[in-house]
Amino acid sequence: MSTQNKKLSAHEPQQPAHTTVTDETASRRTRYLVVSRSGDTLVGADGTLHYLDSPPEDSLTDVSLEPKLMKPEARHAIEYRAVYVEDADLAALTQELGALPEGCRVSTAGFWFYPVHADPAGRARYGAALAKRDYLIEMAYSAYTGESAPVDPHKGIRLTGSGEMVFPRIEPAVMALIMSEDNSRVLLANNRLWPRNRFALIAGFVDPGENLEQAVTREVYEETGLDALRLDYRMSDIWPFPRSLMVCYRVTVDASQPVTHLDGEIHSARWFTAPELAQAIAEQRTGEPKLEMPGTNAVARRMLDEWLQEKGL
């Protein structure tokens, strides 16, 4: 794979807040985020994304990472696109580009541990690229008939020879920040498959026939034995493992009731006050954690940070 005339940049360029699309800006600069079939990408020493100024020669396909409803006046001078390559081609590209002074490598942690605190815009692009990859690269056949379903270049969707439209799959999941009625404590859980010091929010997939409120109520009861007294929607996030949309709620419960683990998935659960939670997160930042909390890339961490900010911590 040739990388001739391809420059690599470690950091985001300065962009104007808004650029009106005129004849002068219609041919905007394009930067490419290279993503392999398995989901790896190019990162620098600081963990943030590297972009190419032109696409690799042996790419599978590429797609825009801009929101579909972006108004022309909101577009920046740079368009970002994801370009997909085979795993071996990304590895070869990394070796060629590794000779540059700023260096690069293939991400081994991938999206799971991407430093959203350092590069939230890049994290959003990476998540979108992974979500689109599943449809553009992997969903080549109808799940019902097994027919080949290539992407129609005019409509941008997959069509079988018999005319069936194969749409992207999105699997909704729910997450719960469980809170005491007085809002002084939150309940975090330890999964049986995790190290004993790792705690996170309750989460699970929506079952067929459920709405989101029923799903989060069920998940809380199944994993803690507690009844939801109140639900408050807070936020949502892309979680492309495999193709989830995570919908997050605050769930108020009676903290005087005993916590049980009905479905066997949870090993233990623990109530945290705001100072206790803030201390656990601070220790994780210093590299000497007694408890492992959700990383900065996870929407669970955003839920916890939001609650702590309301407490002045």
Question: What is each stretch, according to the model?
Answer:
Residues 1-139, 152, 195-199, 263-313:
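Nudix hydrolase/Nudix homology domain
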Residues 80-83, 88, 237-260:
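Active-site-adjacent beta-strand/loop module that shapes the phosphate/pyrophosphate-binding cleft
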Residues 139, 146, 156-157:
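Residues immediately within or flanking Cys/His clusters that coordinate Zn2+
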Residues 142, 176, 249:
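Conserved hydrophobic/aromatic pocket- or pore-lining residues that grip, position, or stack substrates
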Residues 142-145, 253:
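Short cysteine-rich loop/turn motifs with clustered Cys
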Residues 151-201, 205, 227-228, 232, ...:
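N-terminal strand-loop-strand
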Residues 201-235, 249:
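The catalytic Nudix box helix
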